[in-house]
Amino acid sequence: MLFRSSLATQSEFNIGYDPCSNYITIPIIDEIGSLVGIKGRYLGNPDESHLKYFYLEKCNKSRVLYGYWQNKEHIKNNPYLIVVESEKSVLKLAEYGYRNAVATGGKTISKYQVELITRTGCTPIFAFDKDVSKEELDDIASMFIDSMKVCAVIDNDNLLDEKESPMDREDVWNALYQNCMITLK
């Protein structure tokens, strides 16, 4: 199931449902609080005529860090910023009590997103899915200014399945966050 988060979290992030398309709706809010797009996640197993993820209202995802607006006060008061791939992971982390998280919308990151992360003043901790290699994370780290520390959570203990997100199970996330963090630069 996509969202096993509480109604309060879904309400705070304005998660909805479009019965016409059978998509869960995820409003994409930029860093100043403006609605810039709506992402949909097909409810159930999509057939050939439906995409699993689809922008119902298109936006430039490379100019947004999902969750920043909702978590901004927590981010300001934390030395670390957890950077994940998906919107779902931001919601899961909120459920686990981690309100210092944002999503890039995929395993790539834009220069603009790097600038947004840098402006927070936090040390970024990349917690991408298991299928993202350390080399890919090193490439991302190299996009940041030389003096900025960049960390990552890497599953060297093989706690995750191949396509699993570190946030899919709370006990696994806590173990990874506490025991599997490395400094990339």
Cite the ranges covered by each PLM segment.
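Phosphate-interacting basic helix/loop segments used at nucleotide- and nucleic-acid interfaces
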Residues: A8-Q10
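TOPRIM fold recognition
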Residues: V36, V90-L91, E95-K185
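Phosphate-handling DNA/RNA-contact segment within nucleic-acid enzymes
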Residues: D18-T120
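Short amphipathic beta-strand and strand-loop transition segments with alternating hydrophobic
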Residues: F13-Y17
